[in-house]
Each structure stands twice: as structure tokens, then as C-alpha cells.
């Protein structure tokens, strides 16, 4: 009950007292004087959060102190905002603070804030000194209408929200509506959920007002705030009505049931499920947002239980959505806010089990029976099975329908008629009442779109069963915002013509129509062609012939003759027909291209147009021509939408397949819908009894299993019903052929293929026909137990298979249960209620299987652009080799097709213009027909043609890759000055480059700046890594996630070029290197791109690309957002692996970067160098939430004052990781924060002693962190060994122990001399075993002691390295044998200038000897591409045995005599590996062969000839001398020893040390 004292505030009575006071502007003077006069105390404690303090507290203090004088004191305390603060820790902090300020029992606490403040401070008041007085001053809409009223106070616990608390009534609730002026939009909308809830349970009139006022409220709250409070002035009265209405209802309920005996539970509508969602999704999703989703789910639950009409559910959902609140977890905002976090049904039910309303284990939920009315005056007990069905994404159908069942089912309104009725009513003049309208996603999108175009206003009557539309006679206005149409194909096609009728506004001259991913591939081309031909400008914004499209607002198309291809969709025809009366002259619509599809739907449109006052004439001579007069629609007083005949096929089919009876009471012979013939044309021939009147249809199925196949049925008049017919045919005797349904391939999915694939899961054979499907039935008892049925997000697929499931011999799991909402949201309810089918809700099992294997990659073709001479052909060749894709040089391909060279084409009469035209046509052909699996190198001048630029831009905007290859401009110019093979430029080369440069950048989405001076045959390592990023094949992120400790080193140099000598040393032990762009000496885009290229080449590890602003501890200007975005885009274009994105950047920057990131991983960061935030409370939560939305990695960096701050950080991080698995880098800067760096674990930023400065205070090196980890027990020391005999003089301990020390690892490497493998069995299985090197004589003997052996070691037949590995997800350690000898050989040869051989550059190799090392040498030469591989040895038998043990493609040959050498002139070796002992003379016959081979003249002076000596002693062997005398380069054996040990270290530790350090340790004093 409310009362008002004249001009004063309005008061609401609660528990017999007028303690709720509502008005604008009461916070300062009124509250102060009311407190001092009516709630006197010596101490008032005002508690608020840090967001509100500065805005509202100082002014209140001033007024209060002036009014109170010396009689009372006012203390203030602030806490961090957000749900995170609402816990035991914060409550204790407040209580301790109050005690320290001598607060006693007369204290009055003022809770200023939203729900968190009110709930928790109320609980403080309830328990402090066994209870003190408090007042609520709610500042959010949600708190004003809900949480501040009723005395429920509480804190959250890990088990759930509000589980510890007390009933403690406030002495006053001061609701100052002026607080809403500064309330953020999202918070305001959050509060509207509680307002809607109250109206939904209590007052339909108020609910209707909420529906009507949604546009005005949203417009007001989205307007810019001003100091005068004008933002909400237009809705001031509406706001007061909303707050008084909701607060009044709550006060009334609380007064009747203060302690929640039953009635007060009604206020929990939406909360049973909403709180469960909130427990999982907090703090990313707000309370009201969770309640909004909860209300929809609980309304669906009431509908499933049969107590709430479908129309009421639709109306509630529409109202919630109209306030931009989410209605499901699939809402794109919720997905973004929570990073797609799952809400498992079992967890939701567990959370629902901890609810104060419950009766023991029985769950209680508030059920609606109508809008404004609940099913019971309390929460109702609902079984878990029903709740599980509503919450689950999938449903398991148990077969079986009661015998003799006879039911009547009224399907929802026809989607086809509903959408047409909405379009006609919106364009009509006057008011019409539409009854039986389909409540579905499609009609929801249509209604929303019509409202956006301001074409009509609408309201609901009769509990949502009647839609009242007031049309404006076709006066539509273009929309600023795109019309989002989901997957609603009907709406998209109808509205494409309708928006052409729009008039332009001051702010826009066109309207964009868009939809979801599937909608963006569905065809709309013929309709657009027809509109374009009639003067309407329509532009495709993405894929040609599909949405999104931009349609100019031309106030109606020209009219006259319009030709339209109608063989794909009749909706194109209906779209033009309905808009035609508003054309500028009468329309003659000619359908061309063959027989129109679905003529029945065209006839339906014409009949409905007549109902709205426009009569279409069909041409007497040409039945495919229609004459539409000018005019305007006149809305009939009432229009009744008959049930959807396509949907009616499902209940009728259930009757048919189960031998029961079903009646559809409102579809009969006179129906406008073609699908109404389904019962007569399909079910009757299949053996059903069909009775049909003008307005009803009744079907009785034959005995179970007695359905008959139909040899052939043309379903062109009812194409949507073919899916229902197909599932019946699956259990019919014989083969059914269905034709006339070609259009079903371009519906929500390719339905013909979908039916074929899903029926195959039941063991039913189907064949696709050109325009249909053939189904061979089988006895229903023989149907297979199917895999889960995938529905392709297609409502008709889901409902069809639900029909088959009621007869299948096994339970059937149908995925994507909710897709039926498109046309029949309550289908599963009907199946359960009417047909008594047992349903069970289930999770989607396929998600668990595919989650890990879903790393994205792309097989889209890559187009390479750039100046002539920039290296496109070279890069294309590299790319082709790496990706194993064909390379097509478009210039070469053009010459092939034209049968003339490019200069010849240009010199001909065709000239440059003809050449460019041919070039463009070739590009179009390649994009259209070879868009996958190719690499294309484009001509340098291709970008001169605007049409070519548009093609490339469109290609990369739609997921393709266009790569700009560039190198130093001076190098390119010099090359082109020398190149005489191409047409000469008619202008200065440099001018050409600078003219084309912006075009190259415009058409490309990636760029590779080559730091290399020549185009080598082999792709350099930096290019391979760049390509792995842009193609999505890089596994670096997954690799570092799997490591317990990973690091990136922060590079603090102003110019990478000047630090190239130290970079290899600096990056040792790190997994990535950070380029601090803000510290570079120039931010010129080309300079920055070059820095990336140089760093990638020098560091050989992934790059973290960072721009750190001044306020976050860097050097980049805080507000230079435009430049920041340009620099971010350079990072993305250059394919960096990681990009650090500051969360303080504006939304448009964050959005642009994340939408164009490709395969780069975003590190969403926030730094707090001024120590404003605390890990202990919720201060970091807003930044974590934002980072969760935008980042693949979250990076939060605070400042530590004392060591204990690191423990608070660890607790925070653990809490966040429990809720979301997204990796977190969380650190404290400063000396006291070093411990946080030690314990961080994932990608810890580190420094290096060789760097000029540290990137942040307190930063450590990777080696220092490893040392610290060892000290605190986080990194256990491991023992490594060398096994073999003799080994006493081995250099391996010096190598490995030296590297352990350099990298900070606490491990020890020692010798274990033995020639018996069994001696090491216990060692390699000990807990502290880290790995082992194995030498003679154990390389073969150790294999049986291992769990697995690498492919290389298997081929070589020897193991020289043992590595303990733990498979992912397993605690068990397995021992893997590998061989690094061959790796060492390859590395040493590569270092000496040997390049891998290719098919275009073949070469022979040679191995000397036939001992154990020979096999590794053969393997190494094969890896380098050498063929043939000659072996020179004493024993031909041993050589043959070696050759036989390798595959034939190794091409191993024996050289036994100098004559054989002479005969092999064309295949003599350029690489020789010697594996014979060096301390004995070389066998004479072998020596002769070697002399002949080594002294043979070199083919080319440029090509190096190298001999690799595997013997260690003496360091310079006779064979080396022999080779050197013949002009060969030689490599001593110690080089290979160092290299193979270097590889061993990497395999054991995951750390790549400098090779120079490994080499120095091995060489010792020998150099």
C-alpha cells in the first residue's frame, strides 16, 4: 500500500509501517534530517563501495555534519564493488574496523549501494553486538525493487549464494530515484529482470505496461548522461511507476509472509534455476541476467508440466528480450562474458539442491499458470527429471505410446501464414487482431525487425494469445542498426523487399539485414537480382548471393515488369508480391527459368493479400505472370492464423507409426497450406485411415509395423513434409521414392543429405536423387541402435527423428533439443503430455569428445601479393613445400592459358588493358574454383585493377588469407633495375612501389617482411614459424599449457637490429620473447614490422607483441587509441604468436583486435603500478572479467608492498582457475613481489642479465626462477647418467652439468660405467631419474628395458637417449628411447653450409664404414634428401644387410672400386660421413675408392663439399687430411658429440640452450 504526503515523498507500508520512502532527490537533506529525527544515534556508520564513494559520500558528509553538529558522528567505510566482496572475509574486516572505532549497540549503519552492499551490511547489522539498527539506501534498480526490501540479509559461501544470513528488517528504505541517473546501462537492465519478475507473478496490467514501455526506457537509459539529470527525464513517471509497483508488491508479500512460510517464495520466480546459473557464472554474469534466463527456463518447465500456455512463455520471453536481457545461455553476450563457459546439468541440479525453498531433497520451483498469476500461492515441488529435460541440450526418447491412444493436438500457428500476416499487417492501414500467431524465433525476429523499421506498433491481449497490430500504411523508415534475423530464412527473404519501401532518415539511407552463420550461406541471389533490375541498390557485405545485404531506402521500387527466377524458393516470389502494391507503378511479375517451386505457397500469398484488400490477377495466357495493382493494404478487424500444416505432420505421423489416432482440429481440406495434403497424399497410401473435413484432419495408423512404402510420391506441393515422410518410409515395407524437393537442400541445412546420414545411423539405406530421396524401409524391430542424432540446428530434422524414436527398438538420443523452438517450442511437451512418451534430458556427449581436438586451422587457399622482385615466387615455393599444396604462379598460368608471354600480350592490340582484363578473369576463376588447398603467387601489378582489389579484400574478409611479401625497398629496386625478363615499368620504380603500397596493404590481411637477402631453396625457420601461425597449425600455445613452468623474456631494446648479437643468448630458457613496441626508437609502421621480422629470425622462438601505455608502466601515450590500433594490427598482420592487449583500451579497439586476430593468441592484460587494487578483495574482478571476454590468456600485474600480498594473489588465482580454465599470468611487481614470479608457472615474464634494463621492477631471469623453485621444493632435482663402457674420458658430464648450471636447473649428470644392460634397470625406474645418454655397447641392449622407441631409433636400430615422459592426463611415467646421433650429424652438416636436397636439386651422399654409427649416418643423409647414398666398406655382406634393412626409397648403393666411382660420375657425393675408427689405417681398397671419390672435380664452385668425421680422436684424422687435400671442408667428430648432446638436453628439459655453450663445454681446451 502506498501513500503520499502532498508534495513529499511517496511511502510504502511494510509490516505495518511506512518505512519505504520513494522519490527523486531525497538522499542529502531528506535522509539526513529523517535519520537524525526518527532514528537517533550517537554513531552513524555509512558503508558503501569504491565506485560510489566519491560521487555520493562527501556531499552527504557535509550535509550531515552541518545538521548533526556535535550530537552525532558519521563514520565511513568503503569496500570493493561486486559479488566477490560479499563473503566472510569482508564481513569480518568491517566488524573489526567498527570495533576499533568503538561502535556500540546504539550504532545505526547506513548501507549505500546495490544488492551486495545491502545484503552483506544488513547481515553485519544483524550480528554486530547481537543486532544494531540499519537503513537501506539502494542505488541500483535491482536493489530498489528487490533486495533492499524484506530484511533478508546474507553473505555468499563457496557452496552458493546467500546461504549464511539472517532476517533483519531495516528501519528505513530510502529509494532515491536520482541514483538511477548515473547507473550504468547494464546495471539498469539487470534490475529490470526483477521488475519483470514481479509483474509476471502478480500483475498482468503492469506486465503489459512493461511491454509497451520497453523502447522508451531503453532509449532513455542509452542516452548520454548530463549534469542536469535530463537523461531519464522522459521516463521519470514510468520509472516511478515501475519502482512503486515492484516495491509495493514485494512489501505486500513480505508483510503477509515475513519469514518465507510459502507466499514469499513467489518472489523467487526465476531464481531457482537462475541462482544455479549464477553460482556457476558469477561474477561474469549479473544476478538479473541469470534470473532472466531462469525465468524463461522456469516458464518452459511450467509449459512442459502442462500448467502454462505456450503463448505465455513466448510473451514472457519476448518481454525479457525487449529489455535486452538474455533469454538463454546461447545469448552471444553471455557467451562472450563467460568465454563460453559450460553449465553442466548435473552441476545445476546440485546447485538447485541447495535452496532454502526446498523440502528436503524435493526441489521447489515457482510455476506460472498465466502472465500475472502463479500455479500455486507458493513454490511447487517438481521432480528432477522434468527439470533436467528443460535444462538439457539433448533429449533421450524412450520408445512406446499407450495402445488405443486417441488425442487431439493443436499445433502452433503456421509459420508461413504468421510471417505473411505480420508483413501485411505492418504495411497495412489500421488495426488488426491476429489470433493463433506462431510464437517462435522466426516470428520474434520478424516482429523485432518491423518495430525497428517503425512500420507498426503492436501489443498483446488475452494473455498473449492475440497480437494487436496497428499499421502505418507502408510508411517505413530505414534502420541505423542492422536487422538481425538469426536463421529465419522466411523473414530474411520477405524483409529484403520490404526494406526497399523504407524512406531514408537523417541518420541513414539504407538498411542492413544479417543473420547467423548458417543464414550467411543460404541463397538470396535471385531476389536481389530482381530488385536490382528494378532500380533498388542492394549490396552484398560478405558472401555473394547471401546475407548480410545492405538495401538502399528508396521509398519503394520502380515497378513495371519484374523478372524473377522462382525455381529455388517460392519465398522470393511472395516477397516481391507483398511489397509490389507500394511500387511507383503497377507491377507485372514474370517467373522465369522453369516451373516455379512450391506453387501452393505463392497461391497462399495471393489469397492472404486479398484478405488485406489487394487483389492479384494471374495472367490468362501465361500462368507464371502476375499483375499486381498499386494500392495499400487495409487491415481486417481480425485475422486468424491456422495451425502450421508442416508441424501438424509430426503428431499425425506419431499416430501413423504407432497405430494410434490423432486429430488436428483446425486444418482441413480448405487450408491455404500445401502441407495440409500430407495426410491424404502420403499417410493414406501408406496404410493409414484418414478422415478430413473442411477444417479438421484425423489419422489412425495401421497396426504397428504395417506401414506400406509408396513407390513414388511427388512432394513438391509440400516440400517441408518430406522429412516426416522419410522417417515413416524408414519402417515401411518396401522402397519409397520422394521427388520434387530439390529446394530442401538450401533450407536450414541440406535436409536431403541430413536425412540420408541420420537414417543410416538406424541402419536404413537411402539414396539421394537429383530432386529427392529414395528410402528403403526395414522392419522396425531390426533398426540399429543409433549414435546420437545430430539435428543440424534444424527444427524439422529434430521433430522428424522424434517420430521415428517412439517406435525404434532402442532409446534414441536427439541432440540440439531446443532447435524445435523455431516453429514449435513446445513440441517435446506435446510428445510427453499428449502421447505419454517418456523423455529424459541429457548433456551432449559429442562435446566431450571433440573439445580437445577442436584446435582451429584453415585449408583456405593463400594468395601472395607484393611488388615484383619482393620474393613472392620464393615465398610461394616455401609455402608450397611446407603446406604440401600446389603452387600456381598466376603470371605463368596466364601465359599458359593465353598461349603468349605477358610482354607479347601487352605488345599486341590488347595492350595493357587487355592484359589486366585477362589477369582479373584468371583471379576470379581461381577464387571461385580453387579457394581451398592452393598457394597462388599474384602478379605485382594486379592491385592496379580496382575490381581485383575488391576480390582480394572480399576473399580475406571472408576467412581467406592474402599475404603481402615485402623486403627492403632498396633491395627490390636494385633487383628490378637488373631484371630484363619482365615488361619495363613506364615510370620510376620507386614511385610505382609507393603508389601500390597502400593497395597491397588494403588487400592483404598478413604480411611477411623478409630479413633475408637471397631466395634460398629451403624455407628459413622464421618463415616456417610465421606460416604455422597464419595457417593455424602452430601448437605452441598447447605446448606451453602442458608445461609446468614456462617463460617469456621481455626484450627492452630500442632497436632489434642493434641487439642481434645478444638476442640468441637472451632467449635461452624462455618459451617466447616479448617485443616491447612502446620502447622502440620509432613507431613508424614499416620500422615496427621490420623489428618483428628481425626478432623472429634472430630469436627463433614465438613473439609476444606488447604495447604498454604510460599508466600501466610503459611509454606509449594513454589516449592515442588510433595509433595503438594501427600498431596492434601490424602485430596481427605480421603473424605474431601472442599479442598483449590492454583492457583499458576502448571497446572499439578491443573488438577490432579480437575480431581480426586470426590465429594469434590474445594476452588480455591489466597492470596496476600505482597499487590501487588489492588481491584480497574483489578489486581485480572487473579486470579479470573483461580479460576473460577478450583474451586467450589473462595477465594481471599488481604491486606488492609485503610478501603476504603474494599469498593473496595465489588465493585469487586459484579461485579464478576453479571457475574458468583460461590460463592466468598473475604477478606482483616490486622486490616483495618476486615470490609471485617464482610461483606463477604459466608464461612468466623474465629478464636476462645481458639486457640493458628490466621491463618491470622485481623481474627475475628464468635461471633465477628455476633456482628459487628448486629451493622451495617446486622443482625437484633429477639425476642424469651416461651408460656404457669405456666412458671415463667422456665430455658429456661437462656438457650437461654446465648447461644445467647456466639455465638454473638443479639436476646432476654423472657416469655409470657398465657393459651390462641389466645393471641400469633399477636406475632408470627410480623416482629421481631424469634421463640418460647411452653409448657402446648398450645402444641395442637397452631397448628391451624401455616402454617405447622413436621411429628414428627404430630405423637406426640403436638408442642413445632415454627420456622419461608422462602422457597427458596420466601420472604414470614411461621411458622412451630416441637417437640424437643422426640429429647431431644433420645439425653439424647444416652448420657447414649443407642444404637439404630437393627433387629439383638432387645430390648423392656417402657413408664410410659398416659399423653401428653407419645406420645413423644413412638416416641423417636420407633426412637431408640425399639419393643415392653410397656406402664404402670392407664387408659387402654387411653393406647389403644395412641396405636391406632400410626402405627402397633410401636408394643405398655400394661403391667397391675406383672404376665404379668413375662410372657414377653423375651421382658422386658432395657429402661424406665417416664412421670408421681413426686410430687404425684405412683399408687399402676402401682408400682407393675414397681417393677417387674425394678427388673427383666439383660440379659447382658454389656448392660446398663436406666430410663429417665421426671419430673423436685424434681430433684431426687421416681421412680428414685426405679430404682437405682434395679441397673438401671437414668437420671433426667432437662437433657431432656437442650437437647430439645439445639435442639430448632439449629432449630432457624442454630448454634450448645456446649451441655455442654446449660446444664450448665439449671442446674444452682442445681448441
Curated annotation (Swiss-Prot):
Its EC number is 4.2.3.4, 2.5.1.19, 2.7.1.71, 4.2.1.10. Residues 859-1050 are annotated as: Shikimate kinase. NAD(+) binds at residues 49-51, 83-86, 114-116, 119, 139-140, 161, 179-182, 190. Zn(2+) binds at residues 194, 271, 287. The active site is at residues 260, 275, 819, 1167, 1195. Pathway: Metabolic intermediate biosynthesis; chorismate biosynthesis; chorismate from D-erythrose 4-phosphate and phosphoenolpyruvate: step 2/7; Metabolic intermediate biosynthesis; chorismate biosynthesis; chorismate from D-erythrose 4-phosphate and phosphoenolpyruvate: step 3/7; Metabolic intermediate biosynthesis; chorismate biosynthesis; chorismate from D-erythrose 4-phosphate and phosphoenolpyruvate: step 4/7; Metabolic intermediate biosynthesis; chorismate biosynthesis; chorismate from D-erythrose 4-phosphate and phosphoenolpyruvate: step 5/7. ATP binds at residues 866-873. One of its GO terms (cellular component) is cytoplasm. Its cofactor is Zn(2+). Residues 1051-1264 are annotated as: 3-dehydroquinase. It catalyses: 7-phospho-2-dehydro-3-deoxy-D-arabino-heptonate = 3-dehydroquinate + phosphate; 3-dehydroquinate = 3-dehydroshikimate + H2O; shikimate + NADP(+) = 3-dehydroshikimate + NADPH + H(+); shikimate + ATP = 3-phosphoshikimate + ADP + H(+). One of its GO terms (molecular function) is 3-dehydroquinate dehydratase activity. It holds the Pfam family Shikimate_dh_N. Gene3D superfamilies: 3.40.50.1970, Aldolase class I, Dehydroquinate synthase-like - alpha domain, Enolpyruvate transferase domain, Leucine Dehydrogenase, chain A, domain 1, NAD(P)-binding Rossmann-like Domain, P-loop containing nucleotide triphosphate hydrolases. Residues 397-837 are annotated as: EPSP synthase. 7-phospho-2-dehydro-3-deoxy-D-arabino-heptonate binds at residues 130, 146, 152, 162, 194-197, 250, 264-268, 271, 287, 356. Residues 1277-1567 are annotated as: Shikimate dehydrogenase. InterPro entries: 3-dehydroquinate_DH_AS, Aldolase_TIM, Aminoacid_DH-like_N_sf, DHQ_synth_AroB, DHQS/DOIS_N, DHQS_C, DHquinase_I, Enolpyruvate_Tfrase_dom. Residues 1-384 are annotated as: 3-dehydroquinate synthase. It comes from the Eukaryota. Homodimer. The AROM polypeptide catalyzes 5 consecutive enzymatic reactions in prechorismate polyaromatic amino acid biosynthesis. NCBIfam families: aroA, aroB, aroD, Shik-DH-AROM. In the N-terminal section; belongs to the sugar phosphate cyclases superfamily. Dehydroquinate synthase family. This is Pentafunctional AROM polypeptide. It comes from Podospora anserina (strain S / ATCC MYA-4624 / DSM 980 / FGSC 10383).
